[in-house]
Amino acid sequence: MENNSSNAAYLRSERVEYELTNDSTDVKLSFPSLLDNKISLLKGHCCKIDHIVLEYRNQVPINATGHVIIEIHDQRLHDGDSKQAEFTIPVQCNCNLHYYSSSFSTMKDINPWRVMYRVVDTNVINGVHFCRIQGKLKLVNCKRSPNDIQFRSPKIEILSKAFTERDIDFWSVGRKAQQRKLVQGPSLIGSRSMRYAPCSIGPNESWAVRSELGLHEPWAVKERGWASIERPYNQLNRLNPDALDPGKSVSQVGSDQFTREDLNDIISKTVNICLNTSMQSHVSKNV
């Protein structure tokens, strides 16, 4: 890509002849020179390519067929999302293509804009110089970017009288819907564990004695000096210890009463019952 000075309103590239090809090929554009970029950086300016004009002039016979597809890409995005606009014109249609930018860029990065063309469904021989294209860029430098840039849709100026708006088409990218990203903060339990330190229960202590939870009571306010509406179990230690003692666990109760002799007795009784049942069934069948 060529460099040029930004003193004029538009940066004009040379009018270049392009060969017919079915593969995407770059169109030459003129961008600010390295010196202009340095000056803008020193001034703290950002840059916006406000307007892109592509002047297309055909060089094909009158009975030539096919369509030229011209795409404008922003290389700051991945390949699947980089396309900003697309124009489709008949290969014989002389026209001017206009695209208006909707974003700012910094002078610190390589110019993000890229224009490419290709020809489809044509009877023109591949490799023939079928057209001439000149690119014009209008840049805007400013101290601070506004919050939003007003959208202006692309347009095509048709210069050939043999064609109308029904013979061309163009498309421009729209704003993608944004989905809210939820904060991956700590869970509710994790938040509580950070806010309240876990209580340690010592020997001969119940959980209620060590708990810091309790209801809002006059005596609680007097003793602690603050309301405790969110702490409903803070004063359980005032209850009788018997009311708080759940007793022995199931494993403790079972281990005190169940022995190996009890297990052997259960097995013996079960075997005898099975044998008696089997013998009675055999006798009844013989009778």
Swiss-Prot record:
It is a peripheral membrane protein. One of its GO terms (molecular function) is DNA binding. The keyword ATP-binding does not apply. Its main location: host cell. The keyword DNA-binding applies. Pfam families: Gemini_BL1. Phosphorylated. It comes from the Viruses. Keywords: DNA-binding, Host cell membrane, Host endoplasmic reticulum, Host membrane, Host microsome, Membrane, Phosphoprotein, Transport, Viral movement protein. Transmembrane segments: none annotated. GO terms for biological process: transport of virus in host, cell to cell. It is found in: Host cell membrane; Host microsome membrane; Host endoplasmic reticulum membrane. One of its GO terms (cellular component) is host cell endoplasmic reticulum membrane. Coiled coil: none annotated. Belongs to the begomovirus movement protein BC1 family. Transports viral genome to neighboring plant cells directly through plasmosdesmata, without any budding. The movement protein allows efficient cell to cell propagation, by bypassing the host cell wall barrier. Begomovirus genome is shuttled out of nucleus by Nuclear shuttle protein (NSP) and the movement protein transports the DNA-NSP complex to cell plasmodesmata and facilitates further movement across the cell wall. Binds to dimeric supercoiled plasmid DNA. This is Movement protein BC1.
